[in-house]
Amino acid sequence: MAIQHRDPRGGGGSRDARTNRRIKAREVRVIGAEGEQLGVLPIDQALARAQELGMDLVEVSPMAKPPVCKIMDYGRFKYLEKKKQNEAKKKQVVVQLKEVKLRPRTEEHDYDTKIKKVREFLAEANKARITVMFRGREMSHRELGQKVLQRVIEDLRDVAVIESAPRMEGRQMFMILAPNPKMLQSQRDKAKAAAAAAPAAAPAAPAAGAPAPAPAPAAPAPAPAAADPAAQR
């Protein structure tokens, strides 16, 4: 019974909700376990109602006059709330900042490989920091770094948006790209469509107790060959 799960302070509650004997008001407006309005009751009578059902009296609106309380299984309520929070956390997308480093004169094959990586990062809803590293005299040719970053922007225009424009920081020129919202929405739409199509593609199972389909009729046996008159002589 829920009434057995109260803490030593006089009621199974938490800091955000008073329960049972922790409720300080002398009278409260009570909502029943099924959501029915029970009216304004003295606190002892409200507690008795909850105890009769093996449930808790929970103060859900302490600032009301009088406070509003609801009869519920508070232990189960807290369990379900925590379960919902855990499920929500699992669904949350944790955005990470991934970095890809380039040079002012990056070889074509290396460039293509790294652009492919950036596409993967963005498709996973992560952000990407594109950094151009300068060495020695390359610092006097910063326009090469700008050309590299501009090329990246053009090559990723379909999947990325600029979150932080190119800028210098020491011997590095970098920018930050974020996933294009249209691309992410398109991915979600495709996933929903695939999920909806999956059950339809599966063959329907026969209903329980339904007779098995009749076997296809066998092919007729071939007619015997006519005797050769020459062979009979």
Swiss-Prot record:
Keyword Cytoplasm listed: yes
Pfam entry (one): IF3_C
Residue spans of biased composition, Low complexity class: 193-211, 224-233
Biased composition (Pro residues): 212-223
Disulfide bond sites: none
Gene Ontology biological process terms from the UniProt entry: ribosome disassembly
Spans annotated as Disordered: 1-21, 184-233
InterPro entries: T_IF-3_C_sf, T_IF-3_N_sf, Translation_initiation_fac_3, Translation_initiation_fac_3_C, Translation_initiation_fac_3_N
Keywords linked to the UniProt accession: Cytoplasm, Initiation factor, Protein biosynthesis
One GO CC annotation: cytosol
Protein localization: Cytoplasm
Taxonomic superkingdom: Bacteria
GO function terms (MF aspect): ribosome binding; translation initiation factor activity
Family classification: Belongs to the IF-3 family.
NCBIfam families for this protein: infC
Subunit structure comment from the entry: Monomer.
HAMAP family reported in the protein's UniProt record: IF_3
Role: IF-3 binds to the 30S ribosomal subunit and shifts the equilibrium between 70S ribosomes and their 50S and 30S subunits in favor of the free subunits, thus enhancing the availability of 30S subunits on which protein synthesis initiation begins.
Protein's name in the database: Translation initiation factor IF-3
Organism: Anaeromyxobacter dehalogenans (strain 2CP-C)
